[in-house]
């Protein structure tokens, strides 16, 4: 029987546009924050990396906290929309603060300014906004195909935004003066764009009534649970742990690709190549996302598509390594595009997989924790992206890199090559292995079949009586 449809085309586009706002923060932060702090503000990469790592200590708590708060929220707008809408106001303010370190401050005060701004952005406001935005996947439709389509629309907007930010920011900053004040100006413009688009996205969709989400069952007050119980429900779900780990690996991968600004500047001697490689990454991703819903239907599920895609991604990244040592930029771009094409399907249906993961908890534990379940998206983004950026700082510091120097030692150049060529390949291999174990769709089908058999047996027994 065909599933009920809940969304119009404009709902899907409206929802998807929300990741323009998310990537105005995330792509800008991960691609350019470190180079801004080291080369324009003059801070040490190793110290910045350590501060980012310390900041991540707060994230595990705040992700579960905000996920639990979303599950407990009951408002006219729904569970997630208020958090998505109001959380972004803080995102916009703190994003500007991260790129507006006052030059008049002493060195210690500059580090403190950055740490406070970065922690508030990632640990509080981005968490509230991003978990709520992701949770809408399971709160505005129960249709599995629509959930896949939402993921595709979302990440088409995400990668388009990431592409534009990576492609134009270096030139944009140069046109604004190329100094620390120029970075602040660009951050203000990006923050305003994000705030407007996030508001439009939040208002373009409507959450379903809780009775419909719970298949006609109305929760009573005895079914409420706290953050500790929600955490226990999460760790009992092996698929949640796999998705969380995969998300972290993806963001580590992204941080290394973002560190390509150093590789292009010092190894390839042309910082403008960073924007060209952004096209090689994001255009194939967008193409793959367009076809993901069709391929999911053709292969009757997401598992095979995701796994086969990442086999292709591993092959592509291995060939990037070969091309890098050959010194061929055109081949590096071609194989980068091949890898991105393979990564696309997982990006497109990831939110639908998380919705299936949430369904798995409902089938095994009898409780819905949609908001808390989507904490893996924010947790993975922040821990993976944050630790990835921190690792970049540590590795640069270890290699002897000094941002304001006219030349860099060979040890720094070798480290940049390792970060940009080898680490993305290693992370892709680990993701491929995780995806090979992540067949939550089949697990849910088996559980539903078992419940139907049990229900039939109860019906037969009562008929006999």
Can you say where each PLM-predicted feature lies in the sequence?
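Membrane-embedded alpha-helical bundles of multi-pass transporters/translocases
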Residues: 2-465
């Amino acid at each position: 029987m065909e599933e009920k449809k809940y969304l119009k085309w404009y709902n899907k586009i409206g929802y998807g546009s929300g990741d323009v706002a998310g990537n105005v923060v995330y792509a800008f932060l991960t691609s350019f924050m470190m180079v801004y702090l080291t080369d324009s503000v003059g801070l040490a990469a190793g110290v910045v990396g350590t501060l980012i790592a310390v900041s991540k200590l707060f994230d595990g708590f705040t992700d579960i906290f905000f996920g639990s708060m979303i599950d407990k929220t009951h408002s006219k707008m729904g569970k997630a929309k208020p958090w998505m809408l109001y959380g972004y106001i803080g995102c916009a303010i703190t994003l500007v603060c991260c790129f507006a370190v006052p030059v008049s401050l002493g060195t210690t005060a500059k580090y403190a300014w950055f740490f406070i701004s970065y922690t508030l952005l990632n640990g509080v406001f981005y968490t509230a906004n991003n978990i709520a935005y992701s949770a809408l996947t399971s709160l505005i439709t129960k249709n599995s195909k629509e959930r896949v389509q939402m993921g595709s629309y979302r990440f088409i907007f995400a990668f388009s935004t990431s592409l534009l930010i990576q492609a134009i920011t270096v030139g944009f900053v140069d046109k604004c003066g190329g100094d620390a004040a120029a970075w602040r100006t660009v951050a203000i413009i990006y923050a305003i764009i994000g705030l407007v688009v996030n508001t439009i996205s939040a208002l373009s969709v409507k959450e379903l009534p809780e009775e419909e989400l719970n298949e006609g069952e109305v929760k009573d007050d005895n079914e409420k649970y706290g953050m500790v119980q929600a955490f226990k429900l999460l760790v009992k779900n092996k698929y949640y742990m796999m998705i969380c780990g995969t998300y972290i690996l993806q963001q580590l991968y992204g941080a290394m690709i973002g560190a390509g600004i150093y590789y292009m500047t010092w190894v390839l001697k042309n910082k403008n190549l960073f924007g060209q490689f952004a096209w090689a990454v994001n255009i194939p991703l967008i193409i793959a996302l367009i076809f993901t819903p069709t391929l999911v239907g053709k292969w009757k599920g997401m598992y095979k598509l995701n796994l086969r895609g990442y086999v292709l991604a591993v092959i592509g990244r291995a060939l990037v390594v070969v091309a890098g040592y050959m010194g061929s930029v055109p081949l590096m771009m071609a194989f980068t595009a091949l890898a991105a094409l393979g990564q696309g399907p997982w990006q497109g249906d990831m939110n639908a997989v998380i919705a299936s993961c949430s369904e798995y908890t409902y089938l095994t534990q009898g409780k819905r924790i949609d908001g808390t379940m989507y904490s893996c998206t924010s947790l993975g983004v922040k821990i993976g992206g944050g630790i990835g950026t921190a690792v970049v700082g540590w590795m640069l510091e270890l290699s002897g890199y000094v941002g304001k120097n006219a030349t860099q030692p060979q040890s720094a150049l070798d480290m940049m090559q390792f970060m940009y060529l080898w680490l993305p390949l290693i992370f892709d291999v680990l993701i491929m292995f995780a995806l090979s174990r992540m067949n939550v769709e089949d697990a849910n089908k088996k559980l539903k079949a078992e419940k139907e058999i049990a229900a039939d047996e109860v019906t037969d027994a009562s008929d006999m009586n």
